[in-house]
Amino acid sequence: MTPMPRFAILRHETPPGSPRPLHWDLLLEDAGTLLTWALAESPAAGRPIAADALANHRTAYLDYEGPVSGNRGSVTRWDAGTFQWRRRSDREIAVILRGDVLCGEAVLTRADDTTPRWQFVVRPEA
């Protein structure tokens, strides 16, 4: 049986003067890499959050806490667990999260295929 894919949300503190301020990195395991978005705010169920698509990250970040290379700050785990794919297209990704903090359907949507800007929302379980 194939294990459930893993996810993590890392609180990413950046150094002063960094082009991207404090944010939360959403990491979804996919075929040996991590699909990654920078969330503008701390995730909270039911609240839409701006999310910028980033380059895929190494799977080591699922378990990593500490300094980020290149003087890019440091990360601490905010949440982690497993997830199940629900829907996946160029404009929408929906997963069921089973984390220590977040449980429910998480949906990433974007207006068109040309922008890296997405919107992230978690719909809590009833």
Regions found by a protein language model. Give the residues of each.
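A charge-rich, low-complexity, intrinsically flexible signal that marks solvent-exposed coils, linkers
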Residues: 1-126
